[in-house]
């Protein structure tokens, strides 16, 4: 997709999601690190609960419009690992409690989703939608399942005492990402926006 053919509504929605994430983390930092007793507006709870899913769906939609998904996924996942390293360092240095560590956040998730996209991108749209729904349902069914193994948390299986200040497990979120790619295939099949709708 050429730079001049960017889909404005997707850029606007992603920008809004990023702005909301920044505000969410700012409020969290003011409460957690500075100790301010702040009133949490209604939109805070909404964004905290649903903003991540919306952003993942949008990212899946955008995956159908670009290229080099695997390479970009590696970069995004590396950024997620850097955040894990920094937050773990903050804990080890006594700057914050263990709860601040990001073990598998949104950047880890998006990186994995982007790297996996070339594997399933050739699936028929209906099959992709079915797999996406199945992963979403499975993810919510296993949500909060406690297991003894400590290496399954990226898939949503947590161990006793597990905490992560930002947690986006592969299940159900890979399913939401796939449904986003279905949205991209259907709504933006020609990889451009309908400019007449905003004139």
What are the functions of these language-model segments?
Residues 1-199:
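Alpha-helical transmembrane segments and their immediate juxtamembrane cytosolic regions
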């Amino acid at each position: 997709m050429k730079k001049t053919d960017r889909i404005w509504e997707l850029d606007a929605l992603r920008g809004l999601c990023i702005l909301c994430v920044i505000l969410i983390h700012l409020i969290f930092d003011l409460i957690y690190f500075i100790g301010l007793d702040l009133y949490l507006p209604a939109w805070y709870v909404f964004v905290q609960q649903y903003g991540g899913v919306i952003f993942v769906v949008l990212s899946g939609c955008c995956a159908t419009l670009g290229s080099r998904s695997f390479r970009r996924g590696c970069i995004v996942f590396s950024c997620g690992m850097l955040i894990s390293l920094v937050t773990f360092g903050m804990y080890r240095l006594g700057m914050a409690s263990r709860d601040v560590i990001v073990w598998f956040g949104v950047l880890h998730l998006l990186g994995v989703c982007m790297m996996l996209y070339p594997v399933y991108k050739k699936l028929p749209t209906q099959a992709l939608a079915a797999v996406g729904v199945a992963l979403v349902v499975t993810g919510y069914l296993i949500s909060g399942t406690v297991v003894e193994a400590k290496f399954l948390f990226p898939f949503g299986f947590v161990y006793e005492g597990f905490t992560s200040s930002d947690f986006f497990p592969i299940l159900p979120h890979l399913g939401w990402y796939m449904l986003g790619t279905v949205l991209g295939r259907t709504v933006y099949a020609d990889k451009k926006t309908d400019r007449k709708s905003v004139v």
